[in-house]
Amino acid sequence: MPGSVFALMDAAKGRARAAGLGVIDLSIGSSDQPPPEAALEALREATRDPATYRYPLFSDTAPLREAAAAYLAGRFGVRVDVEREVLPLIGAQEGLAHLLLAVTDPGDTLLLPDPCYPPYLGAVAVAGLRVVTLPLLPERGFLPDLDAVPADVRPRVLLLNYPNNPTSAVADAAFFREAAAWCRARGTLLVHDHPYAELTFGAYRAPSALEAGLEGVVELHSLSKTHHMGGFRVGYAAGDAGALAALARVKGAVDFHPYLGIQKAAAVTLGLPDELGRAGARVFEARRDALVPALRDLGWEVALPQASMYAWARVPGLTDSVAFAVRAAETTGVAVSPGRAFGERGEGFVRFALVQPPEVLVEAARRLGTVSRDLPADLARQLA
């Protein structure tokens, strides 16, 4: 379903451009901000150093592992062994897919939130896992109810993501302590995808699942969102030594770690002053402050996000978010992500990526106020 939905959205954006509409694309969560200048300078220097051109071995990743360990200690108070409990990744998405291959067998059960980030579904499918969904409901703050999992379900992995994509919901340290305890009692690996760790607003600061202990917990960190380095494809996993050893064995068969120049840029970035990251977060906070009131003026239901780069809006009376999103793109040029693309529980919602300046977001909301929610017959046939 997600792949077909995004293909429909791409086609709708193409038709809008062909019709001469000024497209405002809020459907993809790719930061429009530049990476830190220090990261760019480190990369430029590395490209002029012939020593960086060879295959990077595990021993070559030590500076990045040490930088990640220092960040985890300084930001979360989490201490990791740089040899056993932190591992560089070619992006967190790569890390998750290979981690599931490393720690599960085909047919194992994975607990997956609904709605969720669509690439999770691909990683689960590649690993051949059985999925049991965890509804994320507004009345629970989009947090899963682990006590509602049937007693006969024995999951190998619980996959979480807070600050959350797509809902922008947040979790506190107590939630992660409870989730980790629940997992340890069942022999379940808790995997936490944490790409929005520093994209937080106001006084809120996102905790780490590793604060609940490293045993049975793996956390995936990325520089794509918080440091605007999506194209660099770099991140790291930290946590349970056994799970990371299994992941390292899988990665040893398929890659040689990120290019050394990119590792150097990432290591420099992780050591930058906290205020630089906070300044970047304030850019997205200002966008949130512009968009949310504009959507509420339309009568849409949207909570004020405390973190992430998204706004998750319920459109009153909406029963087909895909049809709505396609119609919106075709008739107004505003592209949003239909909630159904993130799972059944996403129906009735649309997701906005805060990747345009405040005035453009306000204009997008104005245009969306003109969109009909009627489902075109030809689109209904496509989705049948």
Please provide the spans of the model-predicted regions.
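Conserved core segment of the aminotransferase class I/II
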Residues: 210, 214-285, 372-373
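N-terminal small-domain helix-loop-helix segment of the aminotransferase-like
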Residues: 2-91, 98, 269-272, 285, ...
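Helix C-cap/helix->beta junction micro-motif
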Residues: 16-19, 127, 185-186, 298, ...
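PLP-dependent enzyme catalytic core of the Aspartate aminotransferase-like
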Residues: 78, 327-337, 342-384
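Conserved core of the PLP fold type I
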Residues: 52-181, 198-199, 204-213, 377-383
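Hydrophobic residues in well-ordered beta-strands that form the structural core
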Residues: 112, 133, 159, 191-192, ...
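Conserved glycine-rich beta-strand-loop-beta hairpin in the small C-terminal domain of fold type I
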Residues: 267, 284-292, 302-314, 346
